[in-house]
Amino acid sequence: AALEALKGTARALLDRIAAAKDAAEADEIKAVDGITKDNVKLRDKEPLEKAEKALEGALRDFGGNYTEGESRSLEEKLETVKAALAAIGNAEKAAEEIGKLPSADDAKLSDKSALDRVKEIVAGLTENEKAMLGKDAPGKLDALDEKIKALAEEANSPGTGDTSNPALWIALLFISGG
């Protein structure tokens, strides 16, 4: 009877080891092999989220059944997945901020601070994160920047259309006794 109990325990352990192996090699995890923060695309978000859940589940449910090397490997995969998801998050946040900006046609001088803030966000992105913004984003920022510069120049020139020194006009006004 003791031998049968040991056989049952051994079978249960083997089943647990097989389940741990299956969890570590789940399709969700395999689907994101090779994806890093430096090559991730927006379309990878859903598979990465599934892989993150699968990796967290494997580590949580079977952590004690993996060797130190297997656990480290799973943790490294999880870190890679989280970094890739963070890169997507950065790109999505920047795209959302760009989307909030007015078009160049609707730009006002008061939009300069918002544009500068968004340009700072975009400047902080990696090259791959910038690539995820799409082709239109840099063009929108550049067009808006040009329009705001033109508006600033207009605001700084005298309203008469004469761009000569306004101080001379004021001096003439006082001299003429006006």
What are these regions (language model features)?
Residues 1-157:
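Beta-rich interaction/scaffold domains
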Residues 165-178:
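A cross-kingdom C-terminal cell-surface attachment/processing module
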